[in-house]
Design a protein with these regions (language model features):
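Short beta-strand segments
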Residues: 7-9, 112-118, 193
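Conserved active-site "lid/cap" helical segment
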Residues: 1-57, 61-71, 75, 82, ...
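Short acidic, glycine/serine/threonine-rich loops at helix termini
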Residues: 17-19, 64-65, 122-128, 203
Length: 239
């Protein structure tokens, strides 16, 4: 079997949903801009690309239809480049890589673009009109469990204390801020055009976070739980 390699990587900045610098940018355009930036950086011939595999957790509205194909058009890829949108919730873009790697090893193509995009501003969690199956919800409500509740379950199962979560969160923010200040994230970010000018910096880093401040927050998902807004991933827009 062929060996599989990741030959290049690019991303947009990640900014807060609803109030960040990317809130007015459509997700399909956001993904297309990143694809364009990736091709410019790598010098890959678009004619060699077999498929664009795009992960998206809530593929509806501006993220709807087969968004991967539409992103290909917006990124000026040749018509010969296919497009498929993958939904495995939080693992969607990771699974796009798994799919491409399997295809390469099976000789079903040599060059793939694996991507992911989510605008939590433009398409809210659970989408615009969630309609759980009544029978399934009654019999197995866990099928519709939210990630925050899952985090509580994981913390309980593996005995991860609130203090340990908050220490990890503070260190994560510190490292992210240090990396940004040192310019270590610059090479991977594609600047995105917005109404207020180019967006080229992550907007979700909070270096002012402290263990003392996080300890004052109320649990976000279970009133007797340990997970708070300070130890949860923020709602973001990005690709």
């Amino acid at each position: 079997m062929k060996n599989v390699v990741i030959a290049g990587y690019a991303r947009s900045p990640f900014t807060f949903a609803g109030k960040g610098a990317l809130k007015k940018v459509r997700p399909d355009q956001l993904a297309a801009d990143v694809v364009k930036g990736l091709l410019t950086r790598t010098g890959v011939d678009p004619e060699d690309i077999e498929d664009l595999i795009l992960g998206c957790a809530f593929p509806e509205a501006e993220q709807g239809l087969n968004m991967a194909r539409l992103v290909g058009f917006l990124a000026d890829l040749p018509l010969s480049v296919g497009g498929v949108t993958v939904n495995r919730f939080c693992g969607s873009s990771m699974y796009a890589i798994h799919m491409a790697a399997g295809a390469v090893r099976m000789n079903a193509g040599e060059v793939f673009i694996c991507a992911g995009v989510e605008s939590m501003t433009r398409v809210p969690i659970m989408g615009y009109n969630p309609m759980p199956h009544p029978g399934l919800y009654e019999r197995y409500p866990e099928a519709y469990i939210a990630m925050g509740e899952t985090a509580e379950n994981v913390a309980t199962k593996y005995q991860i204390t609130r203090e340990a979560q908050e220490a990890f969160a503070v260190e994560s923010q510190r490292r992210a801020a240090a990396a940004q200040a040192a310019g270590k994230l610059d090479d991977e970010i594609v600047a995105i055009a917005s109404d207020d000018g180019p967006v080229d910096k992550d907007g979700c880093i909070r270096p002012e976070s402290t263990a003392q401040a996080l300890a004052e927050l109320k649990p976000a998902f279970d009133e007797s739980g340990t997970v708070t807004a300070g130890t949860s991933s923020p709602l973001t827009d990005g690709a």
